[in-house]
Structure formats: structure tokens, C-alpha cells
Amino acid sequence: MDQPEAPCSSTGPRLAVARELLLAALEELSQEQLKRFRHKLRDVGPDGRSIPWGRLERADAVDLAEQLAQFYGPEPALEVARKTLKRADARDVAAQLQERRLQRLGLGSGTLLSVSEYKKKYREHVLQLHARVKERNARSVKITKRFTKLLIAPESAAPEEAMGPAEEPEPGRARRSDTHTFNRLFRRDEEGRRPLTVVLQGPAGIGKTMAAKKILYDWAAGKLYQGQVDFAFFMPCGELLERPGTRSLADLILDQCPDRGAPVPQMLAQPQRLLFILDGADELPALGGPEAAPCTDPFEAASGARVLGGLLSKALLPTALLLVTTRAAAPGRLQGRLCSPQCAEVRGFSDKDKKKYFYKYFRDERRAERAYRFVKENETLFALCFVPFVCWIVCTVLRQQLELGRDLSRTSKTTTSVYLLFITSVLSSAPVADGPRLQGDLRNLCRLAREGVLGRRAQFAEKELEQLELRGSKVQTLFLSKKELPGVLETEVTYQFIDQSFQEFLAALSYLLEDGGVPRTAAGGVGTLLRGDAQPHSHLVLTTRFLFGLLSAERMRDIERHFGCMVSERVKQEALRWVQGQGQGCPGVAPEVTEGAKGLEDTEEPEEEEEGEEPNYPLELLYCLYETQEDAFVRQALCRFPELALQRVRFCRMDVAVLSYCVRCCPAGQALRLISCRLVAAQEKKKKSLGKRLQASLGGGSSSQGTTKQLPASLLHPLFQAMTDPLCHLSSLTLSHCKLPDAVCRDLSEALRAAPALTELGLLHNRLSEAGLRMLSEGLAWPQCRVQTVRVQLPDPQRGLQYLVGMLRQSPALTTLDLSGCQLPAPMVTYLCAVLQHQGCGLQTLSLASVELSEQSLQELQAVKRAKPDLVITHPALDGHPQPPKELISTF
């Protein structure tokens, strides 16, 4: 596009004056200053443009003045020269140039601003103009406080109907509408092409306009599209369409500028550096008729529909960037106008939106941070906060606890405690006279919830509420929502709990409540619930969790105090017997027997569980125990579990927190086995793979000592910390067919140094790095390490095995080493034999079953047996039994 002429008719004379002023200033410079000026000049220039060095290298003062005037134009050339003179240490000449410029041209300082300087002024204007927005109650608030970030998904993402009501879209499908996501909207594709039109679509009221204004604000704040967009303009389509008369695009731009001296022609001369935000484009009229013909000239006065239509169709400024907001049903109607748009769907809350909500609710930053931090640590509760109403409930409870000065870690550590606190807060806030009635209504509500859970019902008729005298009560208003459905003769009214989880919580609470102090068949009812929960795919899982959470001594006291009734201890004893019974008949886990030929294939992480697959039942039992937060009860419940075996669990942080708590409370002699489990969080896995690629690209080998110390805490860090607790009696840990990242090995190594009861460690068919083996060996060699038995199965040769063997010279407690199934090259066997004969080696038993050994290696081992007759070395060839064929060899 040709650059439009300057609006002033005196451009020619002003150019001559500028050339004269430039020459006068440059002639005052010495040769050294002029040389320095030329070098500084090639590094500066508005809008990222600078005069090519070839034109400057041999230019004298006359040539430089001409080049400046022709390349930049009158005012920009003078401003560039002034700044360059200052940088060339000719400040006196720069001051004289500025003074003569004002005298000769006679212009105000606002008009003297170049495009580059006006960018700063315009950004400041936008920041001031859009810093505050009005809420629906007309209260003015800061946009940074008002804006709630959204999830934005590409057009190809799964439809919203594919998700449950409380399910949050995965990060791969949708991204938060933060600056990173906004920047990605105009990201180049695989072929290097950048979209010029992006459409944000979504239903009414989801926040498209606010998001568009936040994009404009963030751009002005320097957070978005740096180096890409010089000017961004917000165009409210509805207002522009209703505005009478005709106006050009240049006029609309000028209306948004802080003054009438804006260099609009120069702005329009580089349309590729402009961003137009068209908000509410679905309000544009349909195509058709001459009045709807798109405008093609930015200086042509036309109707709002024609100007906006020209921008949408790219007939006007085809290289400019467009961000269009529209309702979800409207993009089809806009397709005829849009030119190769890229669409994105605006969705609801993201995880970080929850944090935003907490800070809005509390306002006091310190309290908000405390409340949010504890909720973030409870993954179950944090997931529920995807629903704004649940966020409100949680915040209400936490605010009450903070106002009372209570410790959140004690009163709000589980989902059960938070829900109970919310209900008791309702009772506490009621007048004393209304207390008994409210208690009775809550008991009836719990009974209704229980009947619904057991009968798999979520909808309740009005007559059911009337029978329980709940209709019109305060508890109905607080905990039930009303739905009106069109019926055949009249509207059908039904009620449902504000959240399914609340129904399940109240159902669990019903088992602990009594009527009039006379115990009901609570224990029998609990037995029915628990027997039902033991069935696969049970719908009673969450109710059972809540029940255990209510059985802690502290929760039971709260119930008695607020509900005015006695809670039967029989309920707790029934639940304890049920858990202990699960320990005797717990679903089995595949034994640690794997064909040696499988090798490291078995160390692959488990695939995503298919829908409908039975959940990991032992882990669910641990969740129930975790809810109690009562150490003695958990320890007593786990007495009937000789081992905790978890198979194919894709551990999340909440899973680890649950397991860690139960391990800390485990009784003496208990074992833990993790088989084919994923031991790294999804986001950590991505970071780890990136780190490996970077290490490979830099030619890095195994991790160095310094590198491993800088590793972040692993996903299993809380578990290993629990193992070091003085009250933890875990005696055996086995990790089988898992990938063990270096961070896991580092954290486990540190735990081995302090675990008070751990005497046996099994590392079977795991994928380990050389650095990982080294760190584990260091932990086993630590003087305070109490591990007596180590079982290692490494089907493939491992360079780090020498660290494990070398550890035998220092390990004070180790008496048994089982290397069955490992591949031991001859040099490794030679090294092993040398270590076994070291005076510091206290090993008593070495198992080499299913290990292929050369004749020389066998002879070396025989020599060790003769030198140390008390050392038991088991191998078929050493025991006089022939070595079985390779295809029959199997590891345990």
C-alpha cells in the first residue's frame, strides 16, 4: 500500500526546513563526532527502521542531512537526529537543534511526536482509559481485579458436551486466557504462516468482551505481541453500528487517541503492525445491497457496517491483525465475511481461575494466600472448586476459620472436614431459638440424601420434601436447588442437592445421627453401605470416604456438639472391622514374576485406563483411612494388611499424599509394593523429556554430582519423607517395573539414610539411569542406613551397576544381595569378587540365580567361596547343578 500524504499541505516547505536544520546541526560537529554520529545512527530508528549502513558509511554532513530527511520525513528525522546527537555525546548540539526546530517550525510538542514516540503516549492512554471497568452493579473496579481468566480451546478440541459438569478440560485441549495463551492466538503454524484473523466464540455472558478488553490492556502494559503490534484499537461493533452518520477508519482510530495530533497516516502506512479488536461482530447485518459493500479505503467516510465489513473481509487493510469476538452460534453467519479465520472456543474456569476467585473473595492477600494454599494441596477439594458455587462454600468455611483464629491444617485438611464445617457454620449462625428446629431439618435432609444415594436418585419430588417437613425450610434454601420441568398438564417441580458430593456427604452423615437420643440401627446401616462399596464400580465410593472422615474423634465431637446427639461408637467399630476384613481378602496383585525376555519393555508406564476399568481398590481403602486423619485408627486398621500392593497406578499428588499418610501410620513389619506405576507427574514428565533432549544436544552424558543436587523434588518426595518419620514402621519397599527418574532416586537415597524401620529394598525391572544407581548406592552405603536385604533385577547391562557393587565395601547393615536375573559381564564379576573379599564387606548371602556366567567368572566366584566360607553364594553351577537352557530362565 502506498504511504498516504501527510495531512498538512506544507509538507514540502517543512521538509526543506528540516533539511536545513539538520545540516546546520551536523556542520557543528567535529570529524570525530560526525563519525560517532554515523555509527550511532545505524542503531536507531522509529518503528524498528534504520538507514542502511551502506548509505551512511562515507556520507558527509550534507549527505547525512539528505538521507535523514528523505528516509524518515521532516519531524521524525529531526527527532532521530536529536536523540542520536545525545548518544554521540553532542548534547549541546542536540539542545540547539531542538530549540531551532521549535522556532522555525512553530509546532506544539504534541505534533512533534514521531510514530515511535506516539506509541508510548498511546499505550499510556489505553492503560489509563481501560484500567477500570464497571461491574453489573455499576461499581467501578480495576480490570486486573475484575477479570476472571477463562479456558480457551482451539476449534479442533473436543466439544464441551464431552466433559462432565465438574470436569476441567485437560491442558492439551484448552488453555488459560493468560498472556501466554493470548500470545499464542496469533502464533505461526507449522508452515510458518501467521493467522491474520482470530475468532473467539462462546455463549453470551461467558466473558468474551472482558477478555477482549483485557487483551487490549495487556498489550498496552507491554505483555502482549511485543515486536508485532504497534497500535491496538478496540472496536465495539454494536456502538459503531448505532452511531449515526459516516466516518472513516482513520476517524475511528483518531477517536481512540488521546489527542488530535496523532500521526494516523503514518500508523496506517504499516497496517501489518496494527491490531483491531472487533467485539460483538455477530451484530453486523447480513451481506447484501450496496450499503453493505465493504469499505476499501481507510480515509473514506462510510457507515459503521461498511467499515467493519471491510476489516472483516480484509478488503480494508488486508495485512492488519483482527481479533473478533462473537457468540457461539454466530460464526457460521460470519463465514461469508471472514478471510481464513482461526477459531477458538471460550470456556469456563481453569485451575488458576480458582486462585483468582480466592483473592477476590478474601481481598486480604495474606488470608487469601493461606486459604488457597491449603485448598491447592487437597486435590479432591481443589477439583470441586471448578464449580464457582463450591468455591464460595469453601471460601465461606475458610473465612470463618481464619476469623476464629483456627489452624487450617487441623480443621480443614480433608474434604469431609470442610463440608462438615460448612454445615456446622449454618447451625452456629442460626438464632438459639431456631437451633432445635434446624437440627431436626438437617437430620431429615440427611435421611433424604441417604435414600437418594442408596437408590441412585438425584431428583426429589415436592411431596417427598413435604413428608419430611423440609419444604420452605432454611436447609432447603441452602442445600437444595429447585427445577421446573414442563409436564403434560402442569409444570413438574423437582429438587436436587446443590452438588452431588453434598448429597453423598449428607448421606454419610445420616449414619452417625440419632433421633431423640435413641440409637437407630446405625451400625447395621453402615454394614449395608460398606458391603455395597466393596462391589466393583460402586457408586458408594465417595459416601464411604465421607463416612470414614466423620469417624475421627474430633469430627464425632463436632457432630455431637452441633447436632445435640450422641454418636454411637458401634459405627466406628463396624467400619474398623470392615477395613481389617479387606486386608484379609484384599484383591490380589500380579506376582513379581516376569519373563526375562521382556526386558525393559515392562518398565513402560501404564497406558491410560480404559473407561469402566475397575479402580485400584487398595488405594481407595487408603483414601478412606486418610479421611479420618486419626493415626491410631489407621494403624489399627492396617494391622491385618501384611503388605500394601498398588499396581498400575498413575500417581497424582493427592494419591501420594494419601499413601504417604498411611505409610507414616503403618504398623510394624508392613511392606509396600508399587508395581508398574507412573511415578512422575504429567507436567514433570514433559519437563524431564525436554531436559533429556537439551542434555543430549549439549553432549551431556550421565548426570554429574552438581546436577543431581539441583533436581527438583520428585512426585514421591512426600512418601519418602513419611518413611523417615520415627513412627513409621515400614520394613520393606519394592518398586517393580517402574521408571525411576533421577529425582525419585535422589529422594529415595536420602530416605534410605534415615528410615528407622526399613530393612528390605527391592528394585525389580525398573528403568534406571547410571546417575540414579549411583545415588541409590550412596544412600545404601550411608552409616545410618538399616537396609539388610537388597534385591535388584536389571535385565540389561547397566553401567551404573559398579556403584551398587562398590557400595558393599561400606554398607554397615547389608547382609543379603540378590542380583538374580541381572546380566553381569565378566569384568563386572571380577570387580564383584574383589569387593566381596574386601575387609569392609559384611555381606552374608549373594544370590545369582538365573545369571549367565562365563567359566572364568565361575572360577573367580569359587575362589571367593574358598576364601570366605561363611559367605553363601547361590548359583546353579556353583551348587553343582547344571545351568538350565537360556529360554527356560525366568526371573522372580
From Swiss-Prot:
TM helices/strands, residue ranges: none
Changing R87D: what effect?
Answer: Does not prevent formation of an inflammasome filament
- Tell me where the LRR repeats sit in this chain: 462-487, 727-747, 755-778, 811-834, 845-868
Q: Indicate whether Ubl conjugation appears among the record's keywords.
A: yes
Cellular component, GO annotation? canonical inflammasome complex; cytoplasm; cytosol; intracellular membraneless organelle; membraneless organelle; NLRP6 inflammasome complex; nuclear membrane; plasma membrane
Highest taxon of source: Eukaryota
The residues listed in the UniProt record as binding ATP, with positions renumbered to this chain, are G202, P203, A204, G205, I206, G207, K208, T209
**Subcellular location, in the record's words?**
Cytoplasm, Cytosol; Inflammasome; Cell membrane; Nucleus membrane
Q: What is known of its domains?
A: The poly-Lys disordered region (352-356) mediates the formation of liquid-liquid phase separation (LLPS), an essential step for nucleation and formation of the NLRP6 inflammasome complex.
Q: Which family does it belong to?
A: Belongs to the NLRP family.
Report what the protein is called: NACHT, LRR and PYD domains-containing protein 6
What organism does the record attribute this protein to? Homo sapiens (Human)
